[in-house]
Amino acid sequence: MLRTRRTRQIGVIMPRLSSESCARMVEGISRVLDDQNYQLLLINTANDNTREVRALDTLRHDTVDGIILIATMFTPEHHAVLQSLHVPVVIVGQQYPGFSCVFHDDFGAAQAATAHMLQKGRRKPGYLGVTLLDKAVGLARREGFDSALRDAGLVPQPQRMSIAKFNMESGYHQAEQLFGRAPGLDCLFCATDSIALGALQYCRSHGLRVPDDIMIAAVGDNRIGRVAYVPLTSAHLHYRTAGDKAARLLMDMLADPHAEPQMIKLDYELKCRASTGDDNSDENVWSL
């Protein structure tokens, strides 16, 4: 049963303060909440599932009118606390049955970024992803990569794949391991821009020319990738729009507590730049 007493506060749980994608989502959320005279209560969980569950449990005790969860993965503990909540919840970035969700076309974005390199004649693709427990960034993007390979008549090869964390340093070290066991790669898909930037730095420090020796593409389209020493080809995800739509959806749920859960899927736009041999000299790299 949803409670009716209002505090005019909305809890927003985010996994990483340092993430540009999360910051863009929060910006979209904040604009809507400001317009509706709601305060935003922000909780950073530092990619810690236990802290995320604890944050949900804390907000359960009548401190907010609703919750927006920028999610990465779900555990049985997540399920238990989500089912116990008495305020409306919107999940961003993942799909979760029974709850309203705003999510990206992670499969399509990864497929398009990978296919772009294969269409340029590359035939030895590598993959730097994240844990498959993350159904969006990990699993869906991996499946998009695999699909692009199959469409090009190629077979995914496990020795050409590696799992990284959500940061540049891990991207660098996993690229080092990947190139060590699979020399001769001529293109590399990375699940996030941060991972790709680490891989780009590895290539630079080891004399691999991008894009001549190896092409690199990713998903996210963060601004730092646009101004890298070789600008990064990346599938633009509409993070700020995701935050905006999540907040508006939550406002609708507050107005109608009996509204059915909604699933909102956002599209992507592939931004082709020098890391795949494309010219982006006329692009406004500062736009969001």
Regions found by a protein language model. Name each.
Residues 12, 63-71, 126-129, 161, ...:
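Periplasmic-binding protein-like
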Residues 176-177, 181-288:
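Flexible loop/turn connectors
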Residues 5-115, 119, 178-180, 184, ...:
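Alpha-helical recognition/docking segments in bacterial nutrient-uptake
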Residues 28-32, 78-81, 85, 140-152, ...:
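Alpha-helical structural signal in soluble globular domains
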